[in-house]
């Protein structure tokens, strides 16, 4: 399945340059490993697409609502951080 999502220019460029290998998104849509993520560069100042796009294969999905490693109070105090590595 293919999913289209907006990406702000600074993040789009980091993905394009190979520096960013993850997306943090609201889990209000269903995606699975093997799906295709079509990223469309979106400029929030002009509120329009720039025309640049790229496709990436989804290799791993974790939904934070399902994570119960930490107490709710700690999550509310500190939040989550997504760490990318290679």
Residue ranges and their predicted role:
Residues 1-86:
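Catalytic phosphate/metal-binding cores of nucleic-acid and nucleotide-processing enzymes, i.e., regions
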